[in-house]
Amino acid sequence: MELKCFIEILRPINCLIAGLVGILGATVALGHLPPIKTSLLIFLVVFLECSWGNIINDYFDYEIDKINRPNRPLPRGALSKNIALVYGISLGGVAILIAYLINFEAFIFALGAYLLMYLYARKLKPQPFIGNLVVATLTGITPIYGAIAVGKIGLAGYLALCAFLVNVAREIFKDIEDIEGDKAQGAKTLPIVWGIESSSKIGVIFSVATIIASLLPVKAGIGLGYFPIIIVDGIILWAAYEVLKNPSPKTAGRVQKKLKIAIYLAVFSFLLGSITKGV
């Protein structure tokens, strides 16, 4: 057993980003950074819940990851499945306890997300399109969680909408990328059931919908600091063009990585836009 695998299995960079997005949701809702204590609690809940989600996903994806991602801790034998399960449950449990310290709504929200992550990994992930929607929903509600923690939604609703739409697209492209491994395990993902070309077109539709949704905060009065969203929309549009031109697992893999970069830049745009509102 490798000690570093306890960090690696969390996918800490992703969890770090998720935690920051939770704080961003609160910031966008308020128009300024929340108190340090509140920010820390939001970050910890989201980081630990994200960690739980990654671990339980790897737990149930053990056989598939032997093909698609053999270097991850579980398939390479660096960590046993049972230890990983206990580890994940513990982290998720701590997240729920911390959420209770914020407010009751935040507690219920965290508990619901915890259960949905388990249900997704256990049952919903192999279901065509349903699994994609669940992941996108969990991603989209991250900024909403921060907003709920401070008792105000505000512009965080637009951030959540954009996050949901772009992550539906990204999850579809990831399924296209992983189609061979998923086929080997008998999964029924969207590209397996509907084909790569049709799935690519659906991913493009959600990509374009993201661009349209990204314009809504402008009408709602977000600050001038939101201007980098133009770059984000350009990346998404180019990614959509690429996958339409050559719908294939290789292209989908490249495109989903570009969308991930776009997501990071969008987070930055919303942050700048929220703190410059009214300037």
Curated annotation (Swiss-Prot):
UniProt GO cellular component terms: plasma membrane
Chemical reaction(s) catalysed: sn-3-O-(geranylgeranyl)glycerol 1-phosphate + (2E,6E,10E)-geranylgeranyl diphosphate = 2,3-bis-O-(geranylgeranyl)-sn-glycerol 1-phosphate + diphosphate
Annotated keywords: Cell membrane, Lipid biosynthesis, Lipid metabolism, Magnesium, Membrane, Phospholipid biosynthesis, Phospholipid metabolism, Transferase, Transmembrane, Transmembrane helix
The UniProt record lists the keyword Lipid biosynthesis: yes
Subcellular location: Cell membrane
Residues that span the membrane, as ranges: 16-36, 40-60, 77-99, 104-121, 124-144, 146-166, 192-212, 220-240, 259-279
CC cofactor: Mg(2+)
Keyword Cell division (UniProt): no
Main localization, broad class: membrane
InterPro entries: DGGGP_synth, Prenyltransferase_related, UbiA_prenyltransferase, UbiA_sf
GO molecular function: geranylgeranylglycerol-phosphate geranylgeranyltransferase activity; magnesium ion binding
One of the GO biological process terms: glycerophospholipid biosynthetic process
Function: Prenyltransferase that catalyzes the transfer of the geranylgeranyl moiety of geranylgeranyl diphosphate (GGPP) to the C2 hydroxyl of (S)-3-O-geranylgeranylglyceryl phosphate (GGGP). This reaction is the second ether-bond-formation step in the biosynthesis of archaeal membrane lipids.
Family stated for the protein in its record: Belongs to the UbiA prenyltransferase family. DGGGP synthase subfamily.
Protein name (database record): Digeranylgeranylglyceryl phosphate synthase
Protein source organism: Thermococcus sibiricus (strain DSM 12597 / MM 739)
